[in-house]
Regions:
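A short, flexible loop at the N-terminus of ABC-type nucleotide-binding domains that lies
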Residues: 1, 10-20, 70
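Helix-to-loop junction immediately C-terminal to a conserved catalytic motif
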Residues: 49
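Conserved ABC transporter NBD signature motif
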Residues: 57-65
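A short, proline-enriched helix->beta-strand linker immediately N-terminal to the Walker B motif
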Residues: 87, 153-157
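Short coil-to-helix segment of the ABC ATPase nucleotide-binding domain corresponding to the Q-loop/switch region
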Residues: 94-101
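Conserved ABC ATPase signature
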Residues: 134-138, 142-144
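Catalytic Walker B motif of ABC-type/P-loop ATPase nucleotide-binding domains
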Residues: 159-162
Length: 185
């Protein structure tokens, strides 16, 4: 579950990004945050991942209070939240398998867990035949599916997607949205 209560975020340059935002998202909900550029969507994502802290208000994600989270708890929070970025953020010099393995090793997964989980997740996103490919050998839609696989690889309870179809054509966008909806059910 995600809960924001009267959240305010002001940046040092005097810009107020969020003012008094309250929101509750229950487990299993599929929610879209929409709004024009500069409306605070990216700020909310950064708050939910612990990248930044609110100026005031309360934020809870998967049982973690982000208002006063201890530094040592941030890796635990990040394990429970998978993030899909608009620009994919894949490691260009690593294969699909290596990109996913890297994400698993970062949270302490064993080689055995890695070997078992990666084929399962690649099948889930329809990329089981692309395991040895590098990002530059994949289409934009395939790269986005690798980014989704990376978000899923550590079995998070929450997935946050920052404009997951922003760099894709309409057909690929629909494919990605259907994949995300299927994963949610």
């Amino acid at each position: 579950m995600i809960r924001l209560s009267d959240v305010v975020k002001e940046y040092e340059i005097g810009t107020t990004a969020l003012k008094g935002i309250s929101l509750r998202i229950e487990d299993g909900e599929f929610v879209f945050l929409v709004g024009p550029s500069g409306s605070g969507k990216s700020t909310i994502i950064k708050l939910l991942t612990g990248e930044i802290v609110p100026t005031s208000g309360q934020i809870a994600v998967n049982g973690f209070s982000l208002t006063n989270i201890a530094e040592r708890q941030i890796p635990l929070l990040r394990r429970s939240v998978g993030v899909i970025f608009q620009d994919f953020r894949l490691i260009e010099k690593k294969t699909v398998y290596e990109n996913l393995s890297f994400a698993m090793r970062a949270v302490g997964s064993s080689p055995r867990e890695i070997k078992k989980r990666i084929p399962y997740v690649l099948e889930l996103v329809g990329l089981e035949e692309k395991t040895d490919r590098y990002p530059n050998e994949l289409s934009g839609g395939e790269q986005q599916r690798v980014a989704i696989a990376r978000a899923l690889i550590n079995n998070p309870s929450t997935i946050i997607a920052d404009e997951p179809t922003g760099n894709l054509d309409p057909a690929r966008s629909l494919e990605i949205m259907r994949l995300l909806e299927r994963i949610n059910h």
